[in-house]
């Protein structure tokens, strides 16, 4: 299996596009199916057994909420 290059990308989306992605994610979760998403030109497949967490950060006057999805790629 070809090794994928490391990357760390943050991509902004308009509200309507973000909502559509969340809806597709919720639909996949409810059906216990994998979730496919394209981020900055790369298609990502999130397995149905991924781990979902919500993180909250506060520093100074800034706050951040991150919805995180983590998994280990098979065959590594």
Q: Where would I find each of the regions flagged by the language model?
A:
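Terminal, regulation- and interaction-focused segments at domain boundaries
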Residues: 1-25
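N-terminal intrinsically disordered, cationic/polar leader segments
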Residues: 2-8, 34-38, 42-76
């Amino acid at each position: 299996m070809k090794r994928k290059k490391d990357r760390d990308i943050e991509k902004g989306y308009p509200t309507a596009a973000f909502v559509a992605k969340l809806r597709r994610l919720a639909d996949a979760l409810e059906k216990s199916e994998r979730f496919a998403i394209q981020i900055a030109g790369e298609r990502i497949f999130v397995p149905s057994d991924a781990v979902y967490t919500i993180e909250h950060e506060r520093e100074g006057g800034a706050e951040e909420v991150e919805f995180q999805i983590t998994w280990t790629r098979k065959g590594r």
